[in-house]
Amino acid sequence: LVFTEIRQKIFEIIIKYKKPIKAYEILDVFTEVTGKRAHPPTIYRAIDFLIENGFIHKLNSINSYVGCFHPKVHKECYFLICKICNIYQECCDKNLTENIFKSANKRDFIVSNTTLEIEGHCNDCIQK
């Protein structure tokens, strides 16, 4: 596990952003912070490394990335995503994950990855 300077910087950018961030936004912030222009494939390779090693998650529904605040503790979690402000919450529920795996097994299906994204509205946006 080699945590290169580029991987470290991209991880820091994602964690500090506090909201889901898209790859090209990461590229822009990386250039701004380091003063160096990276090419998109460099950013995507670092993102792939961070996902594969459990440091970040990809939110497919909004094509963005978020930090994992308990890396390597689990592989399956679900996300609550506000459709208005894009704030998210990472949640874990072992029973939910077990039920997904049981349901898949009954259908002769082997799950390799589970990311459940639930869209709705956060309390702050509801109150506005």
Regions from the language model: what does each represent?
Residues 43-53:
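Basic amphipathic alpha-helical segments that dock to polyanions
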Residues 15-16, 31, 90:
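Alpha-solenoid HEAT/Armadillo repeat architecture
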Residues 3, 15-22:
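Short capping segments at the starts of secondary-structure elements
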Residues 23-36:
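DNA-recognition alpha helix
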Residues 57-62, 66-128:
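Non-DNA-binding regulatory cores of transcription-related proteins
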Residues 8-13:
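Pre-recognition alpha-helix immediately N-terminal to the DNA-recognition helix
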Residues 1-3, 106-107:
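Short amphipathic alpha-helical boundary/capping segments
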